[in-house]
Amino acid sequence: MRHGHGLRKLNRTSSHRLAMLQNMMNSLIEHEAIKTTVPKAKELRRVIEPMITLAKEDTVANRRLAFDRLRDRDSVTKLFNVLGPLFKARPGGYTRILKMGYRVGDNAPMAFVEFVERPEVAEVSENSSADAAK
């Protein structure tokens, strides 16, 4: 019996599922928002939220745990230097899933996964770029 087993298999082997979630975590950290199917989005939320909680406290041990799960130095750096401090005061609920209709080919329910807060990006005004071109 499979009582108390809440894992979605997503029609994949365990190694494929692990690699897919790892890639989705890296993409979400890099782009801050991704488009995927609703079941994948719900599974992604289950694995990315503990990673952000881990990043709130920047220690060598936590960085090693994050690298063990992400396997990407750039993602770990952004996680601890940008996202961790951004969500320091928030006690959970770092991601949002927005349902966005159905995919054209197979009618699969699609969703948009994004962080609740986005990091501030320094905007370049048009005047400064025009001055730089001169």
UniProtKB/Swiss-Prot annotation:
Molecular function in Gene Ontology: structural constituent of ribosome
Organism domain of life: Bacteria
Keyword list, A-Z: Ribonucleoprotein, Ribosomal protein
GO BP: translation
GO cellular component, one term: cytosolic large ribosomal subunit
Family assignment from sequence similarity: Belongs to the bacterial ribosomal protein bL17 family.
Self-association and partners: Part of the 50S ribosomal subunit. Contacts protein L32.
Protein name as annotated: Large ribosomal subunit protein bL17
Higher taxonomy: Bacteria, Pseudomonadati, Pseudomonadota, Betaproteobacteria, Burkholderiales
